[in-house]
């Protein structure tokens, strides 16, 4: 208000000065053109000047922050389109809940106990007869009645003769068998700190972890200034990442080129079993609970049995996908963190 009033008073004085100059010019016999020229020169020399800003440092800081924010926002929108998309075959297909009920509806019937007690479950190791076996037997169901006299086709021997093995970590085999499906119960789930560290270090290998831009930046700072995929970043050593995230793999018989693909975050479906996620040959449950479903190829269902069993945090599974279709169904109330990969090199 003081500045505006000051400007008004200045212009009033200038107006009085111009009138006085005009009268004096007429009295001295000056032409109108000469008077206007003299007034113009007078106004140019006496133009009021605004005072400098009172807070120059604050204005500079404001401009720097605005420029930095604009640069970060531009970089985010430039880099985001280059982020790798989710692989289509994995975790992209959803089967109806009727398919799940079709394969496991016999589990609650008394006749299912008969099939589970005919040595088709988990084989005992030597010396295990005296100790109580953990309660994680797989559930076997027959889609079709098997004819023992009918010869087994060559492409069905893998699922007909190699049944799923479920074992503890100390019972893990020393030699890797490619055709033998197995679930190793390590009892070592991923901690929340390990998951957060993985999200910051390898954002390219994660999917489904919904988190705001600033929340993710604040959580990863200062360990990583910009926790998002860089298009110019070198290809990840996924074999090293697998053993870094799950050190137990250094003691397991999997090939050295076994690698991690992605880690997913899944919410349990409102209807249990309404969505089945297709998996590759290697998978690890980081946290949460799920149901594992193994389905043989259609042409082998007269000779092979479907398998369904619950799996827990820390469970490591391997299944040869040439003889089985592998599905995971999230269950329980806690979100499911599951990592998938492959036991063999892609080359």
UniProtKB/Swiss-Prot annotation:
It comes from Pongo abelii (Sumatran orangutan). It is found in: Golgi apparatus membrane; Cytoplasm. The chain crosses the membrane at residues 59-79. This is Bombesin receptor-activated protein C6orf89 homolog. It is a single-pass type II membrane protein. Its main location: Golgi. Residues 80-347 are extracellular. Residues 1-58 are cytoplasmic. InterPro entries: BRAP. The keyword Transmembrane helix applies. Glycosylated. Homodimer. Interacts with BRS3. Interacts (via N-terminus) with SIN3B. GO terms for cellular component: cytoplasm; Golgi membrane; midbody; nucleolus; plasma membrane.
């Amino acid at each position: 208000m003081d500045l505006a009033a000051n400007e008004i008073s200045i212009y009033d004085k200038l107006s009085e000065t111009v009138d006085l100059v005009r009268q004096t010019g007429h009295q001295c016999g000056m032409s109108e053109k000469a008077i206007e020229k003299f007034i113009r020169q007078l106004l140019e020399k006496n133009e009021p000047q605004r005072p400098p800003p009172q807070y120059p440092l604050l204005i500079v800081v404001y401009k720097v922050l605005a420029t930095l924010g604009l640069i970060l926002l531009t970089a985010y929108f430039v880099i985001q389109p280059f982020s790798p998309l989710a692989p289509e075959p994995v975790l992209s297909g959803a089967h109806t809940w009727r398919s799940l009920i079709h394969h496991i509806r016999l589990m609650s019937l008394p006749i299912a106990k008969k099939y589970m007690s005919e040595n088709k479950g988990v084989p005992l190791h030597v010396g295990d007869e005296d100790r109580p076996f953990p309660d994680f037997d797989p559930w076997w169901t027959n889609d079709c009645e098997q004819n023992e006299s009918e010869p087994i086709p060559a492409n069905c021997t893998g699922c007909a003769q190699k049944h799923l093995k479920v074992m503890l970590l100390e019972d893990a085999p020393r030699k890797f068998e490619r055709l033998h499906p197995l679930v190793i119960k390590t009892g070592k789930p991923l901690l929340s700190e390990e998951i957060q560290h993985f999200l910051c270090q390898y954002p390219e290998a994660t999917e489904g972890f919904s988190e705001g831009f600033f929340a993710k930046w604040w959580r990863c700072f200062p360990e990583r200034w910009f926790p998002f995929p860089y298009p110019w970043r070198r290809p990840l050593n996924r074999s090293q990442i697998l053993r870094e995230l799950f050190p137990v793999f250094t003691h397991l018989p999997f090939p050295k080129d076994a690698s991690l693909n992605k880690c997913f975050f899944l919410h349990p479906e409102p209807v249990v079993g309404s969505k089945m996620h297709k998996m590759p040959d290697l998978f690890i449950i980081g946290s949460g609970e799920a149901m594992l479903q193994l389905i043989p190829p259609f042409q082998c269902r007269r000779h092979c049995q479907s398998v369904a069993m619950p799996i827990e945090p820390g469970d490591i599974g391997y299944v040869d996908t040439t003889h089985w279709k592998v599905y995971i169904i999230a269950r329980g109330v806690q979100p499911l963190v599951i990592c998938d990969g492959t036991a063999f090199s892609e080359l």
